[in-house]
Amino acid sequence: DLKDILASPEEPAAPIAVGRRSVTRAGEALDADSEKHVHHYPAADLLGKMMIPIIIDVQAKSVDELGGLVRHGGEEYLYVLRGSMELHSDLYAPLPLGPGDSVYFDSGMAHGYVRTSEEPCSVLAVCAGQGIQQLADTAAKRQRLSQEAELPE
């Protein structure tokens, strides 16, 4: 029936947020340490993001020190801010990267970042697609653990 086709759905669609933004001032990103790297999550206050930006201080100097490669759903863009590193994966030879270099890859491929410079290495990683909620949950867990470690006993 034409009336049924033109009728509004019974449940309204979820509203689409327009004009969202999140400002993260220098030094104010949500920080979460792991044994492998230090992660800084800008825009941590913005929920339901379509991508997750992460500034990573790459500390591991070998895949063994990383404890192996990781994989997660989605895609990842990596841009080296300072220092040098290698992107290791289960499909390609190690890829050397220096300041200003970038790579876009399927993060379902096992991967890991290894610092090759003596000086500190920092990268901007932007994760998008399937699996980013898992990354957000991991970030929240890392922050909780970091805060608990800082509490006096």
Indicate where each model-derived feature is located.
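Amphipathic alpha-helical interface segments
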Residues: C121-E153
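A short beta-loop-beta micro-motif enriched in histidine and acidic residues
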Residues: G48-M51, V63-Y77, P99
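Conserved hydrophobic/aromatic beta-strand scaffold that supports enzyme active sites
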Residues: H39-Y41, P53-D57, Y77, S102-Y104
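A short hydrophobic beta-strand segment most commonly corresponding to one strand
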Residues: M50-I56, Y104, E118-Q133
